[in-house]
């Protein structure tokens, strides 16, 4: 199952300029998802990060993974209409710069859910090359 940007916006509350998932290619609700962020020079962040050498901030790559995790978990009927809140980031490793023109492939696996909290393991790649990986803790409110 894949999701368009319109379907993504029905699931998570994020909107421009903070919506960082453009398309979901695969989803197993409550378990895992694969999606994409198309990185373009038109994004506001590149006006200052950095002029003349635009680089996507690592925290936004983590946020994109967290949003994809939100899509995966909020796709379950029992969480419809809720909001995913970032609780913690562990073992984040940044391996490659991401620049305008790159397509960031996002993959998240929900490894634990207990009550309103859970943990996802995410990885983002560009052309098969690892850009970032992290363990993300979230709350559902």
From Swiss-Prot:
Coiled coil: none annotated. Keywords: Cytoplasm, Lipid A biosynthesis, Lipid biosynthesis, Lipid metabolism, Lyase. It holds the Pfam family FabA. GO terms for cellular component: cytoplasm; membrane. It is found in: Cytoplasm. It catalyses: a (3R)-hydroxyacyl-[ACP] = a (2E)-enoyl-[ACP] + H2O. It is an enzyme of class 4 (lyase). The active site is at 49. One of its GO terms (molecular function) is (3R)-hydroxyacyl-[acyl-carrier-protein] dehydratase activity. Its EC number is 4.2.1.59. One of its GO terms (biological process) is fatty acid biosynthetic process. CDD domains: FabZ. Its main location: cytoplasm. Gene3D superfamilies: Hotdog Thioesterase. NCBIfam families: fabZ, PRK00006.1. Involved in unsaturated fatty acids biosynthesis. Catalyzes the dehydration of short chain beta-hydroxyacyl-ACPs and long chain saturated and unsaturated beta-hydroxyacyl-ACPs. Belongs to the thioester dehydratase family. FabZ subfamily. This is 3-hydroxyacyl-[acyl-carrier-protein] dehydratase FabZ. It comes from Clostridium acetobutylicum (strain ATCC 824 / DSM 792 / JCM 1419 / IAM 19013 / LMG 5710 / NBRC 13948 / NRRL B-527 / VKM B-1787 / 2291 / W). The lineage of its organism: Bacteria, Bacillati, Bacillota, Clostridia, Eubacteriales.
